[in-house]
Amino acid sequence: MARSCVTDPRWRELVALYRYDWIAAADVLFGKTPTWQQDEIIESTQQDGSWTSVTSGHGTGKSDMTSIIAILFIMFFPGARVILVANKRQQVLDGIFKYIKSNWATAVSRFPWLSKYFILTETSFFEVTGKGVWTILIKSCRPGNEEALAGEHADHLLYIIDEASGVSDKAFSVITGALTGKDNRILLLSQPTRPSGYFYDSHHRLAIRPGNPDGLFTAIILNSEESPLVDAKFIRAKLAEYGGRDNPMYMIKVRGEFPKSQDGFLLGRDEVERATRRKVKIAKGWGWVACVDVAGGTGRDKSVINIMMVSGQRNKRRVINYRMLEYTDVTETQLAAKIFAECNPERFPNITIAIDGDGLGKSTADLMYERYGITVQRIRWGKKMHSREDKSLYFDMRAFANIQAAEAVKSGRMRLDKGAATIEEASKIPVGINSAGQWKVMSKEDMKKKLNLHSPDHWDTYCFAMLANYVPQDEVLSVEDEAQVDEALAWLNE
């Protein structure tokens, strides 16, 4: 029969030395010297009955140090329970639990006898005589499943809530309702993605501070700018990407602060009007792009063709409106004919035609190929972004395109047409940051229902231009080249 670690004098010596000195324990057991920021988390969490809430930017090492906290709590307190909570179970496995595995490997290499008493599996960590009781567990708190968090009780209990900003108030009600013991602790960790909810309150009305000495939480901010683990090059890159320290995304993902304002309109009217008068210098290798928004649904009654000069990619993209065409009450067949007539490659060499690829836009795109042999680029901006980084920043391609277009306006890389419709639409695009920390543009249905705003057909074409690929207008294409372009576009449109 397995013996408990409490019978081993070596374990008792570790407890005597490090139960209340986790900073030293991190060094001795795991070979990790915590940064001054990580020290703050450790010093708060190692206190009996502590309630700690941490906002953090990228790269501060919070997941690594949290894994060490979880292991030490289990090691030093007989019968202890650590509950790792997140909206998705896989989120914990990919984050904190990954570090538990690597740090535990270091600990047993330094103190091999520990492996006799503590068992690590793919999804749990427990004392050999206390499986299911003296243990680290993972629980999901996805909406509708909050009651699964109930039933946790122990003399020494630690809840660790990952990405806490996205956890529902109902889940927190269940969790905090279990913290009835003298040494029941809670540690919240997250980027500060939304200015509401329990996690937000833990840094404001529930936080211990000079004006609120009876608050519940020790609130800690980990700013990536101040972390010795974050290279200055990363900070410079994020400043350039987000456009300044006060940009909401920079505040959330770098400074670890709740943004001053995250909901409102994408652009102000003065910014839009300046963009109609601005002189934008196009880069070498620019190409012609015609973006088409097809009327249909959500109160729309106009189709728009926007012919533009385009150069560069992403935050280097420059866009100059050349011609804006608007049509009322035209059929898909009529619109396809107008696109073919207006986007003449003899006048606009190598012009790329991009059409919204859903709804009636799909029919128009099909007609362009069936009647005129033209393969258009279909904009499917309801789809998700491709890279992990982009997925973390943008809810979908529509959000990416709108944010990129707005940044182009603000930084002087886009010239808009002077039409009243464009000015009105561009200055009334409702945008915000959701609980996952992603930019999200209000749906067109909600724009109409909540704000009585019509579909921004003209502005949408400028957003399409941030997604469209183009061919330099002075590039000579052979028949084989054109076939390759058509093949590539067909692949993109799948």
Swiss-Prot record:
Keyword Lipid metabolism tagged: no
Keywords: ATP-binding, Endonuclease, Hydrolase, Magnesium, Metal-binding, Nuclease, Nucleotide-binding, Viral genome packaging, Viral release from host cell
Binding residues annotated for Mg(2+) 2, in chain numbering: D293, D356
EC supergroup of this enzyme: hydrolase
Assigned EC number: 3.1.-.-
Positions annotated to bind Mg(2+) 1: D293, D446
Gene3D superfamilies in UniProt: 3.30.420.240, P-loop containing nucleotide triphosphate hydrolases (3.40.50.300)
Cofactor(s) required, per the database record: Mg(2+)
Positions with a binding annotation for ATP: A26, D27, V28, L29, F30, G31, K32, T33
Short sequence motif Walker B motif: positions: 158-163
Catalytic center residues: E163
Cofactor note: Binds 2 Mg(2+) ions per subunit.
Sequence motif: Walker A motif, positions: 56-63
Alphabetized GO MF terms: ATP binding; endonuclease activity; metal ion binding
Function: Component of the molecular motor that translocates genomic DNA in empty capsid during DNA packaging. Heterooligomerize with small terminase protein to be docked on capsid portal protein. Forms a ring-like structure through which genomic DNA is translocated into the capsid. May have or induce an endonuclease activity to cleave the genome concatemer after encapsidation.
Quaternary structure, from the entry: Interacts with pacA protein.
The family this protein is said to belong to: Belongs to the punalikevirus large terminase family.
Protein's name in the database: Probable terminase, large subunit
Organism: Escherichia phage P1
